[in-house]
A protein has these predicted regions:
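Acidic, PIN/NYN-like endoribonuclease modules and their adjacent C-terminal/linker elements
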Residues: 2, 96, 104-135
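Acidic catalytic patch
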Residues: 40-43, 63-94
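Short active-site oxyanion
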Residues: 1, 33-36, 76, 109-113
C-alpha cells in the first residue's frame, strides 16, 4: 500500500511527547516495507521541525541524528513537482496553505491515501474523497 505522508505525522515519530494512532499506523506500514510518497517540501518541513526541536531542547542532536538515520531507511520517495494550478485550486477551495494543498494534490494525483494529523487537511481530503490513513 502506497500512501502520502505529511510532515505532521513524520515529526510525531521524532518527539516522545507526541503520540498519535495515525502516526503509529503510518509507521507500522513503513516498517512492513510499504512505500510513502511526499512532496519535495516535506524534506524541508521535517528538517525545520527537528531543528526547532533541538533548539527548544525537545530532543538532542544525537537523537536528531538517529531520527534522520531511521527516516533514510524507510521507503519514502519524493514526488515530481505538481502543476501549480492544481495545488492552488485545492488551497483556494479548502482554505489551505499552499503547502498543505500540495499533500492533498499528491494524494489525488497518485490516487492513494493520505496520512496527516492536520485537521483542516484531513477535512479537505474527506471533501475530495481522498482516503485517510488510520481513519
Amino acid at each position: 500500500m502506497r500512501f502520502v505522508l505529511d510532515a505532521s505525522v513524520s515529526l510525531c515519530w521524532c518527539f516522545s511527547d507526541e503520540q498519535s494512532a495515525i502516526a503509529d499506523h503510518a509507521f507500522a506500514l513503513l516498517q512492513k516495507d510499504e512505500e510513502a510518497i511526499v512532496p519535495a517540501l516535506w524534506w524541508f518541513e521535517i528538517r525545520n521541525g527537528v531543528t526547532l526541536g533541538v533548539r527548544r531542547k525537545r530532543i538532542s542532536e544525537d537523537e536528531m541524528t538517529v531520527f534522520f538515520a531511521r527516516l533514510s531507511e524507510m521507503l519514502i520517495y519524493i514526488a515530481p513537482l505538481p502543476q501549480t494550478s492544481a495545488v492552488f485550486a485545492l488551497a483556494q477551495r479548502h482554505r489551505l496553505s499552499f503547502y498543505d494543498a500540495a499533500y492533498l494534490e499528491l494524494a489525488q494525483r497518485e490516487n492513494i491515501a493520505l496520512a496527516t494529523l492536520d485537521q483542516a487537511l484531513a477535512r479537505a481530503a474527506v471533501a475530495e474523497d481522498v482516503p485517510l490513513i488510520g481513519a
